[in-house]
């Protein structure tokens, strides 16, 4: 497994994994009983993409820099890439042009007050901002109350900021908190994989992937699958330590805070009339109470004698 974002090994492994999942029958090609490979051969992908076998072989070996968008589109169609995978392939092509550059520590984007005001205005929904590395960089009181196992985890950084990937793969309690832990793990690894193609020189991102690969066999197996997600929506089931089982719909919205760094606004809501809605409302009451208790007391100036 190649950990170098944008490297030839990354491109090779991604294209080979996508080639292996397509059968000749799915591609409309003749099959043979003596066939030794489960997926498509390189020459078959070349035929489907309208390029020579030699050219596609060179592409799959990682020589992707300078390849035209037309050709990349043809390869994406031949491999039946979805929209996220196609974007990922194009990001890999872009990043391969800068593969020799030294990684740098990217300065975090400051969340402006207007975004925090927006978060705080959503009192009955859990809302937080997540960057491409899956750091939670801002949130409303209900998000902190709902995700309390994550905020209280030993995996938070020195500023008390949780990282979703680090919590899921390095905190044993995550298996209890996320009812469908496997789905959460698959999605989180896929989000990180998309980010390494967008930001191949982000040193903190490389360090995170290296840390997870070293310490978590579960992360390694999911990383090796080369699944990609640009954004993640759906339904999540949580086992909260105070209110019990919650089934929540979550929506991910692009939040434009800078021209380069990716930030998503994540909103968790409950279906009206359900037990989960009642439990989320209870958490919202607790969150509001704790938030008021944490606010400093403002003393009005006393009138003079």
For the regions a language model picked out, list residue spans one by one.
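Short amphipathic recognition helices of helix-turn-helix/homeodomain-type DNA-binding modules
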Residues: 1-18, 67-110
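An N-terminal domain-cap segment
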Residues: 26-39, 99-114, 119-121
């Amino acid at each position: 497994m190649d950990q170098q974002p944008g490297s030839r090994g990354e491109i090779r492994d991604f294209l080979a994994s996508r080639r292996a999942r397509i059968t000749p029958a799915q591609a409309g090609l003749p099959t043979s009983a003596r066939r030794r490979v489960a997926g498509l051969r390189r020459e078959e992908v070349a035929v489907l993409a309208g390029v020579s076998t030699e050219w596609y072989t060179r592409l799959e070996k990682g020589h992707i820099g300078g390849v035209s968008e037309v050709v990349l589109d043809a390869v994406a169609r031949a491999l039946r890439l979805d929209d996220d995978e196609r974007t990922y392939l194009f990001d890999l092509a872009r990043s391969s042009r800068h593969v020799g550059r030294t990684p740098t520590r990217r300065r975090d984007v400051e969340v402006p007050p207007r975004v925090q005001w927006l978060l705080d205005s959503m009192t009955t929904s859990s809302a937080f901002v997540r960057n491409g590395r899956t750091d939670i960089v801002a949130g409303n009181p209900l998000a902190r109350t709902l995700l309390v196992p994550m905020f209280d985890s030993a995996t938070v950084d020195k500023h008390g900021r949780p990282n979703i990937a680090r919590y899921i793969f390095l905190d044993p309690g995550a298996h209890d908190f996320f009812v469908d832990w496997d789905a959460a793990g698959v999605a989180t690894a896929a989000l990180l994989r998309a980010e390494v193609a967008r930001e191949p020189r982000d040193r903190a991102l490389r360090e995170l992937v290296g840390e997870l690969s070293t310490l978590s066999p579960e992360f390694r197996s999911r990383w090796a699958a080369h699944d990609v997600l640009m954004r993640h929506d759906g339904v999540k089931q949580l086992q909260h330590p105070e209110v019990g089982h919650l089934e929540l719909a979550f929506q991910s919205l692009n939040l434009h805070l800078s021209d380069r760094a990716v930030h998503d606004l994540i909103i968790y809501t409950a279906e009206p009339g359900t037990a989960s809605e009642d439990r989320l409302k209870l958490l919202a009451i607790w969150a509001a109470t704790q938030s008021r208790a944490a606010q400093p007391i403002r003393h009005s100036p006393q009138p003079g004698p």
